Regions:
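Metal-dependent nuclease catalytic cores that hydrolyze phosphodiester bonds in DNA/RNA
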Residues: 1-124, 225-231, 243, 247
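Metal-dependent nuclease catalytic regions and adjoining charged, substrate-binding loops involved
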Residues: 83, 90, 154-156, 166-249
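Mg2+/Mn2+-dependent nuclease catalytic core
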Residues: 104-105, 109-205
Length: 249
């Protein structure tokens, strides 16, 4: 049985695919496999912790988060400036009745299911049973992002639409998927964003096309491809040839 305590365990990470894990495999198969098997741990940045601080508040697990992350405090026991900013973001969000309405669902609901025969697990931030799935996201800003030479909406750049497709498929009732979004700007912006069903359908088809390969990689049936760009690939890189500098982009 998957619980909040063992949701991210190595055992469950091997047994189930998740939205974050799927996206990690899309970025770098070798790095994702190393994480799943416990051979590599991605660095936790201050920016990530600020987002996690806001998440923990709405999950009602902030005290536990603070206990697990003493680095967010100064030697005097005060919150560091970045987390005071997180407190301000929280205060701003709680002033908005519409934002809070969508964040008022059942918190951190764990569900398991299958996508094209591959086991998946999800954890929903705010679940309104029979009505809507809501995912909380805190980011730098709402501006489009350059990716692979194209300027695309941040929802697509960060794969939030892919996560929504996975959540909807595993939940199983074809519920609308919304993003409760907030920014880390000096004056936080906020929005409730919908992801159209045709986009979710497109993303789900992509998941179905890729997920069997990723599952086979986890089972050791296929050798993972290295991206040679991520921190994992840099940390395990072995030089085998001299490279013309003009080929380095």
């Amino acid at each position: 049985m998957i619980t909040a305590e063992n949701y991210f365990s190595l055992e469950n990470s091997m047994a189930y695919m998740g939205a974050g894990q799927y996206k990690a495999f899309c970025e770098c198969e070798a790095g994702a496999l190393a994480e799943v098997t416990g051979n590599y741990e991605r660095e936790t940045t201050v920016s990530m912790l600020v987002g996690s601080y806001v998440d923990a508040h709405f999950e009602k697990t902030l005290d536990l988060f603070k206990a697990k992350h003493p680095e967010i405090f100064t030697q005097k026991g005060e919150l560091r400036s970045e987390y005071k900013r997180a407190e301000y973001i929280i205060e701003r969000l709680e002033r908005d009745s519409m934002f809070m309405k969508y964040m008022s669902g059942e918190k951190q609901v764990i569900k398991i299911g299958e996508i094209d025969g591959v086991p998946f697990k999800i954890k929903i931030d705010s679940y309104h049973a029979g009505k809507v799935i809501v995912d909380l996201k805190v980011m730098r800003d709402f501006e489009p992002i350059w990716k692979d030479g194209l300027k695309i909406p941040f929802v697509e750049a960060w794969g939030y639409d892919i996560g929504g497709a996975i959540y909807q498929a595993v939940e199983g009732n074809n519920l609308p998927f919304l993003i409760s979004a907030a920014t880390k700007e000096s004056e936080p912006d906020l929005s409730i964003l919908s992801v159209p069903q045709d986009r979710l359908d497109f993303c789900l088809n992509q998941v179905k096309e890729n997920v069997h390969r990723f599952a086979d990689i986890k089972r050791g049936l296929i050798e993972p491809i290295r991206c040679e760009r991520c921190d994992y690939c840099k940390s395990t890189k072995i030089l085998t040839e001299i490279v013309d500098y003009r080929l380095i982009a």
